[in-house]
Amino acid sequence: MASLKKSLFLVLFLGFVSLSICEEEKRENEGNENEEEDENHEEGSEEKRGLLDLAKHVIGIASKLGKRSEEKRYHPFGKRSEEKRYHPFGKRSEEKRYPPIGK
């Protein structure tokens, strides 16, 4: 009876040891798979980020072109600012024509 208990104890002990070793290997494999998934996810996010930047750039260009065509429709010769209305040749040319007195 004592030898039966010892052999049963030995079998159970070896079974638990082998089971714990298998569980450790599974955890390591899952850890490696998670790391690989994280790396793939990072690469995918970098690609998405690049595509988003490209999309933003294209949308920005398209909006500028839309604004430009709208400005041409309402102002075919360009907008005239207040300065251009009162100084059609620009302030610089006026300063050249009339040099300041006293300097």
Swiss-Prot record:
Prodomain positions: 23-49, 69-73, 81-85, 93-97
Cellular component, GO annotation: extracellular region
Location(s) in or outside the cell: Secreted
Acidic residues bias: start-end ranges: 31-41
Residues modified as Isoleucine amide: 101
GO biological process: defense response to bacterium
Tissue expression summary: Expressed by the skin glands.
InterPro entries named in the record: Frog_antimicrobial_propeptide
Main localization, broad class: secreted
Disulfide bonds: none
Signal peptide: 1-22
Keyword annotations of the record: Amidation, Amphibian defense peptide, Antibiotic, Antimicrobial, Secreted, Signal
Region (Disordered): 24-50, 67-103
Residues bearing the modification Leucine amide: 65
Modified residues (Phenylalanine amide): 77, 89
One Pfam short name: FSAP_sig_propep
Family the entry assigns: Belongs to the frog skin active peptide (FSAP) family. Brevinin subfamily.
Function, in words: Fallaxidin-1.3 shows no antibacterial activity against Gram-positive or Gram-negative bacteria. Does not inhibit the formation of NO by neuronal nitric oxide synthase. Has no effect on splenocyte proliferation or smooth muscle contraction.
Protein name: Preprofallaxidin-6
Organism: Litoria fallax
